[in-house]
């Protein structure tokens, strides 16, 4: 179990919907500090969060997840002045706009990766940090394809690939930063929006999604925090239909484990075995 008591949490997302509900639950876990970085100011939401736990310090910054990494560094230098350190980084910014592929990829994938790359040095044990946990909030259509929301699905597949790659022991054993992901199923705040399909053939299905059964943002937020508390490095969870399920991960490339051993080995014999296995 990961104990959130006394932790310094940084949440990068819009303070509404899933992010707001997740933050409400976090405020009941006796965290010491909560930094919220979002694209627009939402003072009523901040006030609601503060009313849950007056002793938890809440800090807010307007933040564009698609900004260049150099600009991100300036923001997080300011964040660290107030936060001292970050125990938990939650990436929750998301966009589903099939008519704007660049914005969808930049928000869901590129921006998230730049955020992680910017924050990791502050958390890295070998760089003076205390280790910690990175949580990538993503979607179930990052695990299985969506013929309707193709660009959105592709960006979320990227999040899963990034999460699993960064969770490799090659990094974790050195920097002490665990990485996990929570894949949310259809949730009210998402399906309530007007959504466009990638191709017009799928628009009927996109429209029908607005009437489909879905979980509430409150239940999804609760399960995200539960997944964090149960987390181990590299885990992928599904938060859907009010439940929480641990994903069984598979290696589809039969040489994957041998390739990693080869990359980490200085032994000529091991390298020769890898080359022989490919023939």
Curated annotation (Swiss-Prot):
Keyword Oxidoreductase: yes
Family: Belongs to the short-chain dehydrogenases/reductases (SDR) family.
SUPFAM superfamilies: NAD(P)-binding Rossmann-fold domains (SSF51735)
Gene: Adhr
Keywords: Oxidoreductase
Pfam family, one: adh_short
Record-given protein name: Alcohol dehydrogenase-related 31 kDa protein
UniProt GO molecular function: oxidoreductase activity
GO cellular component: cytoplasm
Chain sites annotated for binding NAD(+): 11-34
Record's keyword annotation contains Oxidoreductase: yes
CDD domains in the record: ADH_SDR_c_like
